[in-house]
Amino acid sequence: MSQSYDRGLVEDFGRWQEFSAGMWAWIFHKFTGWVLIGYLFTHVAVLSTATVDAATYTQTLQGLESLLVVRFLEVGLLAVAVFHILNGIRLLFVDLGVGLEAQDKAFYAALIVTAAITVASIPTFLMGAF
């Protein structure tokens, strides 16, 4: 006979406000990792049109680049990739024992650098879209 696990109050949704920077770094790293995996499948699907012929591949790329939403998704992809890389480097240093006392600061620095790179790249990605 098994007993069910008592998880306590399910409606205790306010716990996320108590998360530390390390928990947010873990959540964002997992989320960005899944987004990058999803992008990888999409990227392979688009590249597979090149196996048909060059004209189909060119037509697919031109069709995607003409959509404004794709331009914004590219900016989001850059933000996801930059954060994932910077947080991965932060985790590498933490695993090596470097900067253990400054983990929170390193996480916030990764967020700030990601935001700066993303904002600086917006004109490049949206050039010619309007």
From Swiss-Prot:
For this chain's record, the cofactor binding note is:
The heme is bound between the two transmembrane subunits.
Tell me what topology the record assigns in the membrane. Answer: Multi-pass membrane protein
Protein name in the entry: Succinate dehydrogenase hydrophobic membrane anchor subunit
| Cell location | Cell membrane
Pathway linked to the protein: Carbohydrate metabolism; tricarboxylic acid cycle
* Ranges per topology, Extracellular: 47-71
Q: Which residues cross the membrane?
A: 26-46, 72-93, 104-128
Q: How does it assemble?
A: Part of an enzyme complex containing four subunits: a flavoprotein, an iron-sulfur protein, plus two membrane-anchoring proteins, SdhC and SdhD.
Lineage, please?
Archaea, Methanobacteriati, Methanobacteriota, Stenosarchaea group, Halobacteria
Question: GO biological process: what's one of them?
Answer: tricarboxylic acid cycle
Entry-linked PANTHER family: SUCCINATE DEHYDROGENASE 2 MEMBRANE SUBUNIT SDHC (PTHR41910), SUCCINATE DEHYDROGENASE HYDROPHOBIC MEMBRANE ANCHOR SUBUNIT (PTHR41910:SF1)
Cofactor(s) in the UniProt record: heme
Which gene is transcribed and translated to give this protein?
sdhD
Segments on the Cytoplasmic side according to the record's topology features: 1-25, 94-103
